[in-house]
Amino acid sequence: MKQAGGSAEQKRRAGEAAVAEEVTEGAVVGLGTGSTVAHAIRALGAEASDVSGVATSFESRRRAVDAGVTVTSLEAASVDVAIDGADQVADGVLVKGGGAAHTREKYVAASADRFVVVADPSKESDVVDVPVPVAVVPDAWPVVVDRVEALGGTATLRDAERKDGPVVTDTGSLVVDCDFGAIETPEAVAASLSAVPGVVEHGLFVGMADAVYVGTDDGVRVRDP
């Protein structure tokens, strides 16, 4: 359930600016997942010296290796700054999980001293109104669907596009996309989802980001989350 929008140039500017402004020599960087973060990972390999990365997915690890960035782990290093994208940025809240990597993305971001987001203008919104991805234990997905619908949402098990069956995350979860329409109280929805038996992690990142780098046609705008 990836969200379309934004040009490659806008994404490149956001990713490169975040690396230039946020990453210092010898830093350990949390490497998010997605098309905008891909530009940041390439910039790390090209511009930053003695930097290592903690990958949030198989894809971000592969991009890091291709870029020449040393890959480490949370067991071996503390994360100085995490750089990640978002499906939506709205008033202190991020929605993530379009790439089905939000479980690892959340705990890497939470472990970092600083968490910055890279995005294009299409991801900005005044209200949280895109479906919220929820990673679930495979056997529990019917329970999660029932509970989400009891909360007033519409829940859909995410199907894979290039194979039969559902999407399976790098951590072995299935993904249920939960549409609540416009969410007036993201904190309450986040708490309700966390309390559902079988939920591994949801894609609402409330109050976690420190800054958002938005790539535009004219340059980069840095804003509060």
From Swiss-Prot:
Keywords: Isomerase
Origin superkingdom: Archaea
Coiled-coil region list: none
Family matches, as Pfam families: Rib_5-P_isom_A
Entries under InterPro entries matching the protein: NagB/RpiA_transferase-like, Ribose5P_isomerase_typA_subgr, Ribose5P_isomerase_type_A
Cellular-component GO terms for this entry: cytosol
Catalytic activity from the UniProt record: aldehydo-D-ribose 5-phosphate = D-ribulose 5-phosphate
CDD domains per the UniProt record, alphabetical: RPI_A (cd01398)
Binding, substrate: T33, G34, S35, T36, D84, G85, A86, D87, K96, G97, G98, G99, K123
EC number: 5.3.1.6
Residues forming the catalytic site: E105 (proton acceptor)
Keyword Mitochondrion on entry: no
Pathway(s) per entry: Carbohydrate degradation; pentose phosphate pathway; D-ribose 5-phosphate from D-ribulose 5-phosphate (non-oxidative stage): step 1/1
Keyword rRNA-binding: no
Gene Ontology biological process terms, A to Z: D-ribose metabolic process; pentose-phosphate shunt, non-oxidative branch
GO molecular function, one term: ribose-5-phosphate isomerase activity
Quaternary data: Homodimer.
HAMAP family, A to Z: Rib_5P_isom_A
Family, similarity comment: Belongs to the ribose 5-phosphate isomerase family.
Purpose of the protein: Catalyzes the reversible conversion of ribose-5-phosphate to ribulose 5-phosphate.
Protein name, as recorded: Ribose-5-phosphate isomerase A
